[in-house]
Amino acid sequence: GISLFYNLGKGKFKEKKLLQFSPVFGASYFELADFNNDGYPDIVLTNGDNWDYSRTNKNYHGIRIYLNDGKYNFQEQWFFPLYGTAKAIVRDFDNDGDPDIAAIAFYDILEKPSNGFVYFSNEGNFHFKPSSLPNAALGKWLTMEAGDFDHDGDTDIVLGSYFHNIEEMRSLIGTVDILSFPQLL
């Protein structure tokens, strides 16, 4: 789950539980962003950690947006199913003034490599247009960060890949030269 700890001073804190989930929910990452411009942070949460209890795909894994009512009570507003979702980063990637989402999924990657990295362009009113990059299908993305890495004034995304072994790498990239697949994109 997710909790907020209020600092009472002198090393004392008061906990407020914001969201609670069962252990098989597979929560993997969360980030705060204001999706409805009300001045309160909303929660973007990914759940796709699939190796703790069961390795089967679960239809409840994906990306969720929970809206803050202003009193730090949260209700789910949006859900996109994506098996093995590991992380979602929120930024205005297309510089149009609203928050977009970039997400990576790890465990279902051998069956659907195009789902390893998905970009969601915010179309307004909690409608997000998903898209993927052809080169992103060549990696097994386990980590992702965003920032202006090339110092050109816009937000860039860096993806880091992980493979258990050479056979897993070969099964994902097929006939492509093993030395040419991206470890970083």
Model-derived segments and spans:
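Beta-propeller-forming repeat regions
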Residues: 1-185
